[in-house]
Amino acid sequence: MLEYAHFDGRAISLTKGPREATGADLNEQLRLRAAGEIPRHIAVIMDGNGRWAKQRGLPRIAGHQEGVESVRDIVESCGQLGVQFLTLYAFSTENWKRPKDEVSLLMRLLLTALRDETDRLHTNNVRLRTIGDVRALPSELQNELREACTRTGSNAGLTLTLALSYSGRWELTEA
């Protein structure tokens, strides 16, 4: 469960917590909405999963798997709060420089997550989009992304954008 901490006009703090939402949490959400403090767009740079795992004596992939769980929580929380757009910077062009076995594991993890989560996204009215050089990804992953985006394309709730094989340079060349 992610807990909403505070939005000060520049940044929002989301932290992972062990408890379920309480009546006080729901009242706080209503207060924030009424005050206009819910941001329209939140962007998350997904970083630190490997360090998280290393600090716990776990393999790097365990950190990435925990990252998938965190993404599920973030998407759910943003949808509940009424955030309109969520962008996840999930795999930059720099990530291609990681060891090949780690990149392969990350691609498989993303493929599995898409297969497991697309129905949930659709049910929760989330529209999935991608930005970045998706053609650089493995063809099986490209196909799954295309199918997930098509399946959720007419949803009108939260728009979830995955930035994959993405960089500022890519954005400039594609503008």
What does each model-found stretch correspond to?
Residues 2-175:
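Flexible, compositionally biased loop and terminal segments
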